[in-house]
UniProtKB/Swiss-Prot annotation:
Pfam families: Ribosomal_L2 (PF00181), Ribosomal_L2_C (PF03947). One of its GO terms (molecular function) is structural constituent of ribosome. Keywords: Ribonucleoprotein, Ribosomal protein, RNA-binding, rRNA-binding. One of its GO terms (biological process) is cytoplasmic translation. The keyword Protein transport does not apply. Residues 253-268 have a biased composition (Basic and acidic residues). The lineage of its organism: Bacteria, Bacillati, Actinomycetota, Actinomycetes, Micrococcales. Part of the 50S ribosomal subunit. Forms a bridge to the 30S subunit in the 70S ribosome. The gene is rplB. The keyword RNA-binding applies. This is Large ribosomal subunit protein uL2. Belongs to the universal ribosomal protein uL2 family. It comes from the Bacteria.
Length: 277
């Protein structure tokens, strides 16, 4: 993927850049691997907003991506197409298996139309192949990693992300995540070789608010710009800093997002590195 800059014909296009989509080989998705995707507008079944900054956006259909790949062990597949997926930052690859099945997977960096991929213990260490972590050598770059065996991939699924297999200790593998966190997962968990493609996506500049609206993202208003009835930071004479440590609209301290009693915390060896403010 390469990033193209637009000509400064308007103020919005002056700072705008976009992907050239050179890796995309087909525009229309495979019909049997689509499902309906309804919009919620961030509302629950009572019509109340439970997730802010969501609404509008282009109509989408969900692409059924295979995050397990365990039922096709030993069956080789050919990459028929690399396709765009509006529901994620990564590209997806359409696989045609020798037994006639068709599946979508995340397209790793370097995977091309016509390549052959495989899953199972006999698969080579090559981008796009899926194996149990116990069959993967230490130091390999991985993506689409399971947290529990058979659960389906949970880690390193967005564009350009990857996990490094640092070591193996007993029945566990030690992984270094993109955030800097080091954690253990079972050697029976599956992972896919390589890093997720479309890594240059971070260099794309939207250029105007409308491109966010096309994606279904609504504006985010600062608390200090609100009234006291709307936010703890609201009000004051003139412009103020809020007068207190940053909090959510409901008064909870900002920045802490991880649940305190999450069961999988016992597998974390080192927490993710804090970003400097």
């Amino acid at each position: 993927m390469a990033v193209r800059k637009s000509n400064p014909l308007t103020p919005a296009r002056r700072g705008m850049s976009f992907s050239d989509f050179a890796e995309i080989t087909r525009a229309t998705p495979h019909k049997s691997l689509l499902s309906k995707l309804s919009k919620t507008g961030g509302r629950n079944n009572h019509g109340r907003i439970t997730a802010r900054h969501i609404g509008g956006g282009h109509k989408r259909r969900y692409r059924l991506v295979d995050f397990r790949r365990s039922d096709k062990d030993g069956v080789k597949a050919k990459v028929a197409h690399i396709e765009y997926d509006p529901n994620r930052t990564a590209r997806i690859a359409l696989l045609h298996f020798l037994d006639g099945a068709k599946r979508y997977i995340l397209a790793p960096s370097g995977l091309k139309q016509g390549d052959v991929v495989e899953s199972g213990s006999s698969a080579d260490i090559r981008p796009g192949n899926s194996l149990c972590i116990r069959d993967i050598p230490v130091g390999t770059i991985l993506h689409a990693v399971e947290l529990r065996p058979g659960q389906g991939a949970k880690l390193a699924r967005s564009a350009g992300s990857s996990v490094r297999l640092s070591a193996k200790d007993g029945d566990f593998a030690i992984l270094k995540l993109p955030s800097g966190e080091i954690r253990m997962v079972s050697l029976s968990c599956r992972a896919t070789i390589g890093e997720v493609g479309n890594g240059q996506r971070l260099n794309v500049s939207l250029g105007k608010a409308g491109r966010s609206r096309w994606c279904g993202v609504r504006p985010s208003v600062r608390g200090v710009a609100m009234n006291p009835v709307d936010h703890p930071h609201g009000g004051g004479e003139g412009k103020t800093s809020g007068g207190r440590h940053p909090v959510s609209p409901w008064g909870r301290p900002e920045g802490k997002t991880r649940r305190a009693n999450k069961p999988s915390d016992r597998f974390i060896i080192r927490r993710k590195s804090r970003k400097r403010r």
